[in-house]
Amino acid sequence: MANLKEIRNRITSVSSTMQITSAMKMVSAAKLKKAQDAITAMRPYAEKLTELLQNLSATLEGEVGGAYTTQREVKKVLLVAITSNRGLCGAFNSNVIKEIKNRTDFYAGKQVDVFAIGKKGNDVLSKTHKVHGHHNAIFDHLTFENVAGIADNLTEKFLSGEYDKIELIYNQFKNAATQIVQTEQFLPLAPLKSEVSASAGDYIFEPSKEEIVLTLIPKSLKTQLYKGIRDSFASEHGARMTAMHKATDNATELRNQLKLTYNKARQAAITNEILEIVGGAEALNG
C-alpha cells in the first residue's frame, strides 16, 4: 500500500484536475447556450430559403441551375471536413475523421482530397490526404460574411472543373449530449425540381424567376456551409461540456476512493503505533 504522503499527493493532484474540468464544463455550458441559440435561430431561415428555391424552380420550364447542377463523371472529389481547433471534446473530431476515411474508401480509385475547417481535422488528415486549404481562424470570428468567402472558394473549385463533386462532413447538433455526423452534398446541386408547396402563391416576379433562382443558388450554398459550421460549433461545445462533466464525475469518484484509502492507511498506521506502544509497555513491565 502506498504511504500516506503519496496518497495525499494523489488526492491533491486529482482535486486540481477536478477543478480544471469543472471550470471547463461551466465555460463550455455558457458558450453552448450562445451557439445553440444561433443555430436554432438560423435553421428556419435556411429551410425557408431552400423551400423558396424549390418552389421557384418547380414553376420553371426546362432544367434550372445551369453550371451548379452539372453532373460530370466523378473523378475528383473534395471532402470538406468541419472539426474544431481544440480537443477535450470526446469523439467529436474523431467521428468526422472516421467518416472522411469511410467516404475515401467509398470513392476508391478516384482522387479524393480534403478541405479542412478546424485545426484538429487538418492535423490528422494532412497525413493521409492532400489538403486543399484549411481555415482554423474562422471560429474566432464566425460570421456569415467570413463563411461566404469560403463557400465562394469551394464553389469556384467546382465550377472551374477542379473537382467533380464536393461534400460537407460535420457534426449536426441535436442536444448537448448528442451530435450526429452528417454527410451532405454541396455541389453539384440536385436538379432543382420539386412539387410546388401548397403555400406557394401566384406572383409577378421582377426580375424574372430564372434570374432570381440563379441569384438564390450562391446564397443557398453559403447558407448551407454556414449552417454546417454553426451546427459543428454548437456540437463542439456540447461534446466538450459532456466530456468535462464525465471527467469531473470520474475525478470526484477517484478522489473519494483515495480519501477512503488514505483514512484506512492512516487508521492502520495509528493502530500499529498503539500496538507498538502497548508492546513496549508490556516489555517494560515484564
Swiss-Prot record:
Top-level taxon: Bacteria
Protein name, per record: ATP synthase gamma chain
Source lineage: Bacteria, Pseudomonadati, Bacteroidota, Flavobacteriia, Flavobacteriales
Function: Produces ATP from ADP in the presence of a proton gradient across the membrane. The gamma chain is believed to be important in regulating ATPase activity and the flow of protons through the CF(0) complex.
Organism name: Flavobacterium johnsoniae (strain ATCC 17061 / DSM 2064 / JCM 8514 / BCRC 14874 / CCUG 350202 / NBRC 14942 / NCIMB 11054 / UW101)
Family: Belongs to the ATPase gamma chain family.
InterPro entries (alphabetical): ATP_synth_F1_ATPase_gsu (IPR035968), ATP_synth_F1_gsu (IPR000131), ATP_synth_F1_gsu_CS (IPR023632)
Pfam families: ATP-synt (PF00231)
Membrane topology note: Peripheral membrane protein
GO process annotations (BP): proton motive force-driven plasma membrane ATP synthesis
Cellular compartments annotated: Cell inner membrane
PANTHER family (alphabetical): ATP SYNTHASE GAMMA CHAIN, ATP SYNTHASE SUBUNIT GAMMA, MITOCHONDRIAL
Presence of the UniProt keyword NAD in the record: no
Any one GO molecular-function label of the UniProt entry: proton-transporting ATP synthase activity, rotational mechanism
A cellular component annotation (GO) from this entry: plasma membrane
This protein's UniProt keywords: ATP synthesis, Cell inner membrane, Cell membrane, CF(1), Hydrogen ion transport, Ion transport, Membrane, Transport
Entry annotated with the keyword Nucleotide-binding: no
Self-association and partners: F-type ATPases have 2 components, CF(1) - the catalytic core - and CF(0) - the membrane proton channel. CF(1) has five subunits: alpha(3), beta(3), gamma(1), delta(1), epsilon(1). CF(0) has three main subunits: a, b and c.
Name of the gene: atpG
Main localization, broad class: membrane
